[in-house]
Amino acid sequence: MTGKILLTMAAVALSASFGLRAQDGTTAYNFLNISPSSHVYGLGGHNISLIDDDVNLTEQNPALLGPEVEKQVALNYMRYIGDCNFMGARYGMRINDHSAWAAGVQYFGYGSMTATDVEGNITGSFSANDIAFSATYSHDISDNWRGGITMKFMTSNYESYSAMAIAADLGVNYYNPESDFSASLVLKNLGGQVKKFNEKYDKLPWDIQLGITKGLSDVPFRLSVTATNLNKWKLPYLKRSDDNSTTSPLQVKDSFTSNLFRHLVFAGEYTPTERIYLGLGYNYKTRTDMSTYSRNLLSGFSLAAGMKVRGFGFGVALAQPHSGATTFMLNITTNINELLR
């Protein structure tokens, strides 16, 4: 019965998506590409195949949600570029031995901005923010396969303008605990605006992702590769002809190799115990997106670390998504059942 519910919800989401995506406009809502999970953020920003009892991972792939997150609460906070602050909360609940649900909210605040008239005269200040609400359902298809769906509602408020959008994520995961191998496929941000800012509808950053994670048998280490933007092969970028000069001519990079690696995110984790992890991620797209600006050796790299202590899980991540802007993310998770013991 629950399997039929999952298929019905997926069909409705796809039907709604095709209708909404027919609207003309530009891509917006790129804040949906920022993961609220410090674990994922520190592994390159994308990972849809990571197996862990962390309800935050459902944001990457609804099929990663399972009964193991029974009554788990997760909080996240990130100081982003400039005065931007991202924060949110997520809660997971077991339905039965094969199904679970979760709900979450994410707030993206962009700080105070200067308001001007058409002649450039300062008239005051205003604030801007995005809020995303989500609900996730997952169900075990078999012993090794699990499917899931996330429905999202987004509202945007920029000065006196507002907009709303709906979207869905569809995911499936295969996991073999004996070989510690996980593989996932996710269709993200299928949907569109239901209320527009002006005369045109903005498109959502829809994405097809494929990922694998493999634990090594002899050492406590696991590797991940995640392919993103599979719905669009060409991802050209601009690069200075001289990396040491900010005024040298720009060149378009659009070779097969550059396109290939701009789709891929690589990550490795050291897990000495079930309670500790140390991770390193590399996102070539993030690094090359900064090619027109000054960048350093660490551009595109990110770090993640986490540990569980007395019923609480703590996760931190460091990354540099933009030139000269190092970001820090903090996650705190706990299980209500453990707190009440």
Give each language-model segment a name.
Residues 1-26, 268:
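Bacterial Sec-dependent N-terminal signal peptides
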Residues 21-341:
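Subset of outer-membrane beta-barrel
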